[in-house]
Amino acid sequence: MMNTKKLIKMAKKWQQRAALHRKRISFQRSSSATSSTAAEKGCFVVYTTDSTRFAFPLSYLSNSVFQELLKISEEEFGLPTGGPITSPFDSVFLEYLIKLVQRRMDADTEKALLMSISSARCSSQCSLKLQERSTQQLLVF
């Protein structure tokens, strides 16, 4: 069992790394790509910032951690109209998250993970505002 403080620290580190490498994954519509990008029945597909594809069972949508992950994805990249769902996290973090969900993490670990995800979302929004301010100050001088 991991210590919750260590888990929070690890999640923050992964989120900071993911924030450095954020990008949007474009959806290719070729005949060869449609078979590989289509989700299996009963699954939904999420792409990470490092272009790794994950297929999750629909039952994961009832998990509060995945709900928070999808909210952050919506805030970061918007709702996809014809393309894939893109996660603001990298594949290492999602693999770790999958292992925690499969092992049925206890309530304390889930709460700590949700708090770290939420705090990283707030800190990334604050850093964007600081970047905007510094850009505006550069333009004034």
Swiss-Prot record:
GO terms for biological process: auxin-activated signaling pathway. GO terms for cellular component: plasma membrane. It is found in: Cell membrane. This is Auxin-responsive protein SAUR64. It comes from Arabidopsis thaliana. Belongs to the ARG7 family. Its main location: membrane. It holds the Pfam family Auxin_inducible.
